[in-house]
């Protein structure tokens, strides 16, 4: 990330801090902001609505694109909430246990409607009822994005609907300890519902840490994640049992990561904003990652996973995956290995169409790298 990119990213972060803490920024600082560059970075981090509200809070009238982004965020959240109510009503009717996840719950902790933008809604449900849920979603006008996933099915419908229906919280490859395989045992039923469940606050936070860790160690995770940590801890920290949380995160090897995220969030969103060098580096890393991570970071992770020692080795292993990879992403190949052949051509087709730009970008980054970067992984 360039120095200019870091500066604009920090401008975005300071505006988020301003509106969340209700602490106005100095006029001379506000005068030097570049609204166009700021808007681009905010879109990258899915923070245009929050920063629009921050600009207004600081008595700056944003132009039309900012106001439109805020209005879209509010509208989309309302549409997703209404649609989620219909989906969960069906799950109740069919006696299927379920649990809304992540952002659909976290957004309620933010001080203003639409402040936390939503790209999708995630719902964990009884995996044995996958066919029933699939039939319902298709009848409701949804189509699958790609093939059925190993741990979730992503359903899309115009104009803005995106629901990830989770069979598990993580794939087996991501949950190497098997900790989240017994998630249902940790859930508590919501009083006014028969089949809706929730985590305790402690287990919600543990999942929040694990989800952030997955992205942070992969392609990266954006600044919105830090805002989520601050918002959750601001509401819940005093009542949380951190002895239990730390003990559980030790099992996952994530206790140090949780401490870093908690300290960074609390120090960044404090009155004096004093961060250690490690915390400053974490903020810069998140500012460079965007909402869903950064492709260069993801390539580094993939290179390690593939144990590729050269550009050629990386590309060959990406183009011709192992059988373990096929079993992981296309579960039907476990019992029917011959399906690798049609799935291979299906994957090539997607690489050339749906994922064309992403794959071209990946190839460009690979070709720019020198061989030493792969050997130094």
Regions found by a protein language model. Name each.
Residues 1-119, 125-377:
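Conserved NTP-donor binding/palm subdomain of two-metal-ion nucleotidyltransferases/polymerases, i.e.
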